[in-house]
Amino acid sequence: EEDVEQAISMIRKAQKPFIFVGGGAVISNASEELRAFAKKIQAPVADSLMGKGAYDGTDELYTGMVGMHGTKTSNFGITEADLLIVVGARFSDRVTGNASKFAKNAKILQIDIDRAEINKNIHVDARIIGDAKVILRKLNARLDPINHDEWIAHIERMKDMYPLRYDKSVLTGPFIIQTINEMTKGDAVIVTEVGQHQMWAAQYYEYRYPRSLLTSGGLGTMGYGLGAAIGAKMGCKDKTVINIAGDGCFRMNMNEIAT
């Protein structure tokens, strides 16, 4: 309870809060509470690869992924923030880059169920250990709505200045992913293998729901996608399931077609 009080004090004092969401928010089924929290404190939201879908990728507060494969808005936003609220993310090197320069202007509040993740890769100023869904519900109950209109307007300007770009004169991976997004209206289950196509799938598809992206983001296991897609279709028979694969990954486990 003392940690919750400290977090509330930090949130109330912040002028430029930013929320960073990882796979822990998906595991804890915290999407509803996360959305309410972001709206209440009027903070932009970015995610990691494994956090995709925890927050609606079409929402106005969403800024995209963080890190080496992230958007400029997310990365610049975190650099400018005075408070970074991290929900269920482990600060991998793909996210932080040079750890000594990550979120250098911000106090960091980490929410995680695993005590071992606290201060492991990045030093934090405060932490709350527990289930993200439960903790966010507590914070929502204790906080009044906070206005950060100027901060959000600044983030919107960055979105306009730094959109994701690709060459539209030729057939490219980003164009294909974006077309799939338009055709499925963001309502499919996307499965990926590992490689550049995996990053395109994370960047150019708008994930609106948790568990709508199935990908091997920790160990990065090539050959994961085909079997995972078959399993996803068996579990979600009413959903369109699309496996996005490179030739090398596909050949590793193409024997799954025999299933």
Label the predicted regions:
Residues 1-13:
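Conformationally flexible catalytic loops at phosphate/diphosphate-handling active centers
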Residues 51-154:
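Glycine-rich, acidic loop regions that bind phosphate or pyrophosphate groups
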Residues 73-75, 80-83, 88-92, 199-259:
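Thiamine diphosphate
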Residues 154-233:
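Active-site diphosphate/adenylate-binding microenvironment
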